[in-house]
Regions:
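Short non-catalytic regulatory patches outside canonical folded cores
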Residues: 315-415
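Residue position in alpha-helical solenoids
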Residues: 31-38, 92, 131, 172-182
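Amphipathic alpha-helical repeat scaffolds of TPR domains
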Residues: 2-19, 40-70, 97-114, 137-156, ...
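Helix-turn-helix repeat elements of alpha-solenoid scaffolds
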Residues: 16-35, 72-88, 114-127, 163-168
Length: 496
């Protein structure tokens, strides 16, 4: 039976999904879980994980799971399982060069999108589309990416980002429209024919394109102060680390600026731009930490900085270099911006809570249970990725794989992290309480941390923008105005 199911499980999963029957889906999940437990890493296991993700995603839809019910401590268990399974499937598909990689990547984007994490979904919807390949991902990914771009563009206060998102959405829809006869996905075909936003985008596409071309010429005229700046900007762009939504659709010169700011917001007359200034401090800290990481990863510091320190070795090829220490410092700085962001969230949204603010699921759930905002949802679920739940009782959602990043942060702050290339030790190790990792592992983790923090800052700005759109022009206790905040670069001299 197991041998037969191993050969037919993809078809069996499709049948279970098509049935729409919970009992059938549960039975298939149980059989596939058993098969998975006896399988080793490889293409077959990647496909099993992909199928498990699809089964749980379908079950979540049937049971009407909601991603915003974390406010009542009701968690979409099947949706979380679906996301985690497809993440594992994607990692394994890359490792073993799966021919199914684009379908898995598109489903990963669909799962992330379901949690309102639209910025991250855009990343996974992006690949070289080939409309001659008769696979669903070639049509689903560009359509969904275009939809996400159009959804976000109206909340982007920076005009150049809005123009970019409109143009890239138009470009995708225009190409799909030109290849309509090749579309095999029924749902996408129907959407292309019937959706009003698609028709409007195609109608106004030529003017969008003209506006984009004018802007593109202007943005491409950037002048560098020196070669180091050019190399640094290119590194930030390629790694999608600019605080700029344009960097999510392109990685070249027009994205080379940290444009996001605290949106214009309603205040009482006479009140200063303190929320905006607080966000500027967070933004500045992130950008300086990013430059520190760039230098730590790319520019060797002098060896004499370690001379005369008499550092102890445990004979495991430890790395005490200044570069490695600065990677650690950069990670701590990046993480520190998240707790500062939590404090700003508390103050801007006028949350009445005592004690410290922490960017973690428990604090966000307790503090934002009465605020409905899709980008607060995004921040909540992003915080879940960064949470080590080993010792947290007041949280019921499963811990995603990225919890190792939070553990790294905690050990950098409260324990110690040894960078070592050794595969074994000559010691008993009973006194060894360090977290150990290689230079490659901590370097990869650092980039991942910075991407998470960058995305969190963008989601926060979108949350504020969304909230301001819902606000009335007047508060009940007095006359208010919208504050357009001054920037540091606008001031030729200090105010005082």
């Amino acid at each position: 039976m197991d041998k037969e199911f191993k050969q037919t499980f993809p078809a069996e999963c499709d049948k279970a999904i098509a049935s729409g029957n919970i009992k059938t889906i549960d039975a298939t999940i149980e059989k596939l879980e058993k098969l998975k437990s006896n399988s080793s890493e490889g293409l077959v296991l990647s496909q099993m994980l992909y199928c498990l993700s699809n089964l749980h995603f379908t079950k979540a839809g049937i049971e009407n799971e909601k991603i915003d019910q974390w406010r009542e401590s009701v968690f979409p268990q099947n949706m979380v399982k679906s996301l985690n399974y497809v993440r594992q499937a994607y990692s394994m598909a890359i490792k073993f060069n799966s021919l199914q990689i684009l379908d898995i990547q598109t489903n990963l984007a669909n799962n992330i999108r379901a949690f309102n994490r639209f910025i991250e979904a855009i990343h996974y919807y992006t690949f070289d589309y080939n409309f001659n390949l008769q696979i669903d991902s070639q049509y689903v990914a560009p359509y969904n990416k275009a939809y996400m771009l159009m959804l976000l563009k109206d909340l982007l206060s920076e005009q150049s980002a809005s123009i970019h998102y409109s143009y890239y959405a138009y470009n995708l829809i225009d190409k799909l429209n030109a290849n309509q006869e090749k579309i095999t996905h029924t749902g996408i075909k129907n959407c292309m024919e019937k959706e009003a936003w698609v028709k409007n985008l195609l109608k106004w596409g030529s003017s969008v394109k003209l506006e984009y071309e004018k802007l593109n010429e202007q943005l491409n005229s950037i002048q560098y102060d020196n070669l180091e700046q050019k190399i640094y900007y290119s590194w930030c762009g390629q790694n999608k680390l600019f605080l700029n939504p344009i960097n999510d659709v392109r990685t070249d010169i027009p994205a080379f600026e940290d444009t996001i700011q605290f949106p214009n917001y309603v205040v009482k007359i006479g009140e200063g731009p303190y929320y905006s200034a607080a966000f500027s401090d967070i933004k500045n800290r992130f950008c300086k930490a990013r430059y520190l990481l760039f230098n730590a990863l790319n520019n060797p510091f002098p060896d004499w900085l370690e001379k005369g320190l008499n550092l102890t070795t445990v004979l495991e090829y430890e790395d005490y270099s200044t570069n490695t220490e600065f990677i650690k410092v950069a990670i701590k700085l990046a993480f520190s911006t998240l707790d500062s962001l939590a404090a700003l969230m508390k103050n801007y949204f006028e949350i009445d809570c005592k004690g410290k603010c922490y960017f973690n699921p428990s604090w966000i759930r307790k503090s934002f249970s009465n605020i409905q905002n899709p980008y607060i949802d995004a921040l909540y679920w992003l915080s879940c990725d960064l949470t080590d739940t080993d010792n947290i009782e007041d949280w019921n959602a499963p811990n995603p794989s990225a919890g190792i990043l939070r553990k790294l942060r905690n050990d950098l702050e409260h324990n110690w992290v040894r960078i070592s290339e050794a595969t074994h030790t000559i010691w008993l190790g009973e006194h060894d309480y360090a977290m150990t990792c290689t230079l490659e592992q901590i370097s990869t983790a650092a980039l991942e941390v910075f991407r998470y923090v960058r995305t969190a800052l963008i989601y926060f700005v979108l949350a504020v923008q969304f909230n301001e759109k819902l606000k009335n022009e007047k508060e009940s206790d007095g006359l208010c105005v919208t504050m357009e905040t001054p920037t540091y670069n606008d001031l030729s001299s200090p105010i005082f």
